[in-house]
Structures are given as C-alpha cells and as structure tokens.
C-alpha cells in the first residue's frame, strides 16, 4: 500500500470516527508520505465527516452539542497535521455544533474554526486559502480577536463566557484567507485585490 500511495494522484479519508483514523494512521510512514506529497506536490487529500475533521493539527475528538460551552465538554486531540492553524467540525449546522466549535477555538484562540454544513466542503490551497463548494454553508469561527474569556478561570462544567469572537458565513464560491482572516466574495475578487497590491508596489 505504500507503493500505491506513492503513485496515486490523491487519497480520500471516509467518515466514521476521527479518533480511530488518527489511531490507525498517526505516526505512520503511510501518513508521512501523504503529508510530504501534499506539501510538496500537487497531491489531493480529501476527507468527509470524520475524515475532514482529522485533517487539522488540532482535532475535535468529541463532545455533545447540548453540553458545549461548558468548560471541558469538548474533547481535543491531535489530528493528521496536514493543515495548521485550523479546527474543523462537520455536520455543523444540522447538528447545532456552533457552541462546540466556539469552545474548541476559544481554548486555542490563534486558530480558525471551520464548520462544514451538509453537502458542502472547502477547497484549501496553499495551506491557507479556503474556497467554499457545495449547496450549503461553511461557518468560520475566528478567535483571533477574543478580548475576554473566563475559560481558564472556571471549573469544569461551568459556563464559558467569550467576548470579541468573530464569525463569517460562507456560501458557494466565497473565499477566506486563514492567515490574514480576510473574506473575499470569490476568487476573482481575490485576484483583483492581489493585482492591485502588485500595481501599488
């Protein structure tokens, strides 16, 4: 199977249990080949549901939507580490996982949370450019501007307070830059802005 992954044009991780995926593939030569090819070649890595959640360095292992925003209700672990600076959650809108992703992000405030709706995904290029695809929504939860939270001062099970968290809702074609935290209407508007920046230099 190592030879197959060396020759393949891409790989897709299915849903199920993200912790099981990381237990099976974490710290293996198989995963290392995938990571090196993803970073250095035009190699496509895809995931659905749990497979998408496992892509990031910081990964949600579990935690119910009803208990979210009570300190400690969201369980965090290590993902595949293909993408840094993000936390990904799936079935986001239909299962009401807003609180779950907010707690995960406020615990790691330098990250950007990506909540994937049903029948919707994101194309991530250059490790930081997100383009929404599909018929539903992607919700971005940005903890970079949080100016107050009590999460480090309260006991487990107590309500979490947050001030200054930012949220963006992306539909098909919308673009978000993870590094700069900037929203673009589409790739064309991004390219126009980059061209203007080059012209001004």
Regions from the language model: what does each represent?
Residues 14-15, 38-59:
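Catalytic nucleophile loop
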Residues 27-31, 62-64:
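Glycine-rich, phosphate-binding/catalytic loops in enzymes
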Residues 21-22, 56, 63:
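Glycine/Thr-rich phosphate-binding loops of Rossmann-like dinucleotide-binding domains
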Residues 18-28:
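Glycine/threonine-rich flexible loop motifs
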Residues 1-14, 175-178:
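N-terminal beta1-alpha1 cap of cysteine-dependent amidohydrolase-like domains
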Residues 59-201:
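C-terminal and late-domain segments of enzyme folds
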Residues 4-7, 29-42:
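Catalytic-core regions built around general acid/base machinery
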Residues 18-19, 52-55, 121-123:
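Short, active-site-adjacent cap segments at secondary-structure transitions
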